[in-house]
């Protein structure tokens, strides 16, 4: 497989895999343009489809972790006809090569405890590749890491991520433009909540400093209900209404 590194100079003409076109793609691309200056790398297959890795120096990651000297993987996604050909391994190998070249301690990434969850990495794949759990959030989301330096201090969640909670009742959503699907679905859920009289508050995170102190281990999409973390899975309006009815 041939790969392309999406950079500031070519992003306007290249697709970004998870959003091929439309306004949701533009929102994601604008977010990426700002992150490139902070060291973000977006590396994808030359073939059209969902096959890419996105990572950034952990100091600039939009998640509440203490991981100075590490690379943080925002997303590693291979699906559809491109799945099952070893491309995930190739993408990860490129990230590790880059980490070594930069003299990083290693790489880290979020996953669910024990099983694959939507919008999180597969823990079985990571374990097979040598990753270990460095920290665990109360909501069952783990921080996994693969060290390149034996003496490196493992990355950790900040307390706000390790013990996720909010004070408000009803539904509270924190989200960013890191995932293009939020651009489409968050307004749909807001509208559905309003129509059905469901208390719902959406907080759009637009700054790194805010993201690094969100009361959840994920910031791309973190939904709370009556103070408790519910899911990192981006909800459609129908899925949200079903959840609200439970």
Question: Model regions: which residues?
Answer:
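Short amphipathic alpha-helix that is part of the acyltransferase structural core
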Residues: 1-48, 159-161, 169, 181, ...
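Conserved beta-strand in the GNAT
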Residues: 44, 48-59, 72, 77
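A conserved beta-turn-beta hairpin within the catalytic core of GNAT-like acetyltransferases
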Residues: 61-73, 83
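Conserved GNAT acetyl-CoA-binding A-motif
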Residues: 99-117
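Conserved catalytic-core motifs of GNAT/GCN5-like acyltransferases
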Residues: 110, 127-144, 230-233
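C-terminal "cap" of GNAT-fold acetyltransferases
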Residues: 138-163
């Amino acid at each position: 497989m041939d790969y392309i590194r999406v950079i500031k100079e070519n992003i306007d003409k290249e697709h970004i895999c998870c959003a091929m076109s439309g306004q949701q793609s533009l929102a994601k691309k604008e977010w990426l343009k700002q992150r490139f200056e902070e060291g973000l790398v977006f590396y994808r297959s030359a073939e059209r489809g969902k096959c890419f890795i996105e990572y950034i120096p952990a100091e600039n990651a939009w998640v509440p972790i203490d991981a100075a000297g590490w690379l943080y993987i925002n997303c590693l996604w291979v699906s559809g006809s491109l799945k099952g050909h070893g491309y995930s391994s190739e993408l990860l190998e490129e990230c590790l090569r880059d980490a070594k070249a930069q003299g990083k301690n290693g790489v880290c990434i979020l996953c669910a405890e024990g099983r694959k969850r939507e919008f999180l990495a597969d823990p079985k794949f990571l374990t097979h590749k040598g990753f270990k759990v460095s920290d665990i959030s109360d909501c069952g989301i783990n921080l996994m890491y693969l060290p390149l330096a034996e003496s490196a201090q493992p990355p950790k969640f900040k307390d706000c991520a390790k013990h996720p909670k909010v004070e408000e009742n009803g539904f509270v959503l924190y989200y960013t433009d890191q995932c293009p699907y939020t651009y489409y679905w968050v307004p749909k859920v807001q509208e559905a909540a309003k129509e059905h009289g469901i208390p719902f508050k959406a907080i759009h995170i637009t700054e790194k400093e805010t993201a690094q102190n969100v009361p959840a281990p994920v910031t791309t999409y973190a939904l709370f209900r009556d103070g408790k973390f519910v899911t990192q899975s981006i909800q459609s309006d129908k899925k949200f209404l079903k959840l609200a009815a439970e």
